[in-house]
């Protein structure tokens, strides 16, 4: 999905602006839309976009299921506008969260076969996240080479259920 759509002189996307974290949230928003409205026709029309967002995100993962911040193409990740915020752990949690919500959408649309691997992949991403980003000694998620600790990284690992409720509560209290 394009990160920016301009209205003038006529509606058009701004080429070259793809915000991968927002693209994954599109899938979650479509699930919420379907749950709220029951509008299966629109959700089915937009289903190929959901699949594409997952495909784009998964291409950015290493063989050991860690989001690779240097893998081409390097997508714009917003999460927070803070310049020195390390986004790797947040992206890891968001991808797992989006995969699970996208699979829930697939089930509602009768598209389970197309999305059949998504729960397994989400599990692998979460397992890799715990191994790579979870600092057991301090009970927090760390991100990037400097092992940055942030509320946002904790939140995405909590939302994705990479951390248990107890671990999440401790992490948030520790940050």
Task: Go through each PLM region and give its residues.
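Active-site core of glycosidic bond-cleaving carbohydrate-active enzymes
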Residues: 1-175
């Amino acid at each position: 999905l394009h990160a920016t759509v301009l209205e003038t002189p006529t509606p058009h996307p701004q080429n070259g602006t793809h915000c991968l974290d927002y693209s994954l949230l599109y899938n979650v928003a479509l699930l919420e839309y379907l749950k709220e409205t029951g509008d299966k026709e629109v959700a089915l029309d937009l289903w190929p976009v959901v699949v594409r967002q997952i495909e784009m995100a998964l291409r950015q993962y290493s063989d050991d299921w860690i989001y690779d911040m240097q893998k081409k193409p390097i997508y714009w990740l917003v999460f927070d506008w803070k310049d020195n915020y390390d986004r790797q752990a947040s992206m890891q949690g968001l991808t797992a969260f989006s995969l699970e919500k996208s699979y829930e959408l697939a089930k509602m649309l009768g598209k389970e076969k197309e999305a059949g691997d998504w729960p397994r992949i989400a599990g692998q991403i979460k397992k890799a996240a715990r191994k790579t980003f979870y600092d057991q000694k301090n009970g927090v998620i760390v991100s990037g080479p400097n092992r940055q600790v942030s509320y946002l990284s904790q939140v995405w690992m909590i939302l994705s259920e990479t951390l248990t409720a107890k671990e999440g509560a401790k992490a948030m209290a520790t940050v």
